[in-house]
Amino acid sequence: MEDTKIRLAIYPGTFDPLTNGHISIIHRAKHLFDKIIIAVAQDSGKKPLFSIEERVSMINTTFFSDHMVDVENFSGLLVDYVEKKNAKTILRGLRAVSDFEYEFQTSLMNRKLCPEIETIFLISDYKWLYISSTVVKTVASLGGDVTDFVPENVLICLKTKYCQSKSNLVIT
């Protein structure tokens, strides 16, 4: 009998905002999984620029025609959410050794909490190694051009947020 189980990965994060680095990880992961759920964290301990609704909306807009990608928000323990979705894989992107240190510790804790769940790491494409949501927000807040680092819909949302006080964010 043929195994028809869907290979599902959960890609968690705050995505504040979604960057082209995140998108690259998702597109590459689509070669490994049948379905990817982008799980937007509500209570990550960070103070987001965008509300949970705004972040989910930006990601939904980016992936609106992609049947392999779903977007949901979640709160609480990631492993509880992963179990609820009947998934066995957490997907994470790595840019640098510093990312690995944190992600390694987190994956070990997740494994301790739920041994059936594996964490898969994808190394960021070299074009996006230096890009993070934090860097994008910092550059945008200072009026810098972030056109190359985020999808157009996110660029517009950043402009809206930051142009309330500044009007020099470049949009091409």
Curated annotation (Swiss-Prot):
Q: Which GO terms describe its molecular function?
A: ATP binding; pantetheine-phosphate adenylyltransferase activity
Question: Pathway involvement?
Answer: Cofactor biosynthesis; coenzyme A biosynthesis; CoA from (R)-pantothenate: step 4/5
Name a single GO biological process: coenzyme A biosynthetic process
Q: Chief localization class? A: cytoplasm
The record's subcellular location field reads: Cytoplasm
Q: Does the keyword Translocase apply?
A: no
Q: Which cofactor does it need?
A: Mg(2+)
Q: Name one GO cellular component term.
A: cytoplasm
UniProt key word Nucleotide-binding? yes
Task: List the Pfam families.
Answer: CTP_transf_like
The UniProt keywords, alphabetically, are: ATP-binding, Coenzyme A biosynthesis, Cytoplasm, Magnesium, Nucleotide-binding, Nucleotidyltransferase, Transferase
Q: How does it assemble?
A: Homohexamer.
Q: Which NCBIfam families match?
A: coaD_prev_kdtB (TIGR01510), cyt_tran_rel (TIGR00125)
Report what the protein is called: Phosphopantetheine adenylyltransferase
Species assigned in the record = Lawsonia intracellularis (strain PHE/MN1-00)
Taxonomic lineage is: Bacteria, Pseudomonadati, Thermodesulfobacteriota, Desulfovibrionia, Desulfovibrionales
Q: Which gene encodes it?
A: coaD
